[in-house]
Regions:
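A general sequence property marking short-to-moderate contiguous segments
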Residues: 2-22, 41-114
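A short, amphipathic edge element
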Residues: 21-30
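Short loop/turn and low-complexity linker motifs enriched in small/turn-promoting residues
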Residues: 29-32, 45-49, 113-118, 127-132
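Short, solvent-exposed coil/turn segments at beta-strand boundaries
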Residues: 35-42, 49-52, 62-68, 127-130, ...
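Ser/Thr-rich low-complexity repeats and stalk/linker segments
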Residues: 116-122, 128-187
Length: 187
């Protein structure tokens, strides 16, 4: 990775805005695209310039322990979809499409720390042009102009609704976690 994932992720968690456009160059080698936080877990999404200038998408999972964020893992893949124009709702068929996702085991702790169990799950979303924000359970996530978003959770996939500029619901978004056979299910 050509950037410090922890430092850049913490910047997003502290309120730094994601990039408005997903454009890389020889000078701009990585861009923050999206962030979501659910209590003591978070996921961040970045676009980076890979070998030969090919865009790559990176998602990092983080956990807050004793007031300090740490990265646990994540995933990556082709990022060329992020550099394309946003699809229209009529073409996408939904306010957003869950294109990929994954999971990372939570910290097991040490004898000094309380043991945490379970997983941190995330879903990568491609959001329709008409959608300006997502309601993720009780959270509100603005969607940047490039239309990439990430959603994080620890138990059941959240209820996600696409919202337009007036705040009206455009419709539900089905979350398909990595390895799922059915929308909204894990495993």
């Amino acid at each position: 990775v050509s950037y410090d994932a922890l430092v850049e992720s913490v910047r997003l968690l502290e309120g730094a805005p994601p990039a408005g456009a997903a454009r890389l160059s020889r000078r701009v080698r990585h861009l923050p695209l999206a962030v979501d936080r659910d209590g003591d877990v978070a996921a961040t999404m970045f676009l980076r310039r890979g070998v030969s200038g090919v865009p790559e998408l990176d998602v990092h999972t983080l956990e807050l322990v004793d007031g300090v964020w740490s990265t646990l893992g994540g995933g990556g893949g082709p990022g060329d979809g992020a550099t394309r124009g946003r699809p229209r709702l009529v073409d996408l068929g939904s306010p957003a499409v869950s294109s990929s996702g994954g999971g990372t085991a939570r910290t097991s702790g040490s004898w000094l720390r309380r043991r945490r169990s379970g997983w941190i799950w995330w879903a990568e979303l491609r959001v329709a042009e008409e959608v300006t924000a997502l309601r993720v359970d009780a959270r509100f996530l603005p969607v940047a102009a490039h239309g990439c978003a990430v959603v994080v959770w620890t138990r059941q996939p959240p209820q996600v609704t696409g919202l337009d500029a007036s705040g009206s619901a455009v419709g539900p978004v089905l979350i398909r976690p990595a390895g799922s056979r059915h929308p909204g299910s894990i495993g």
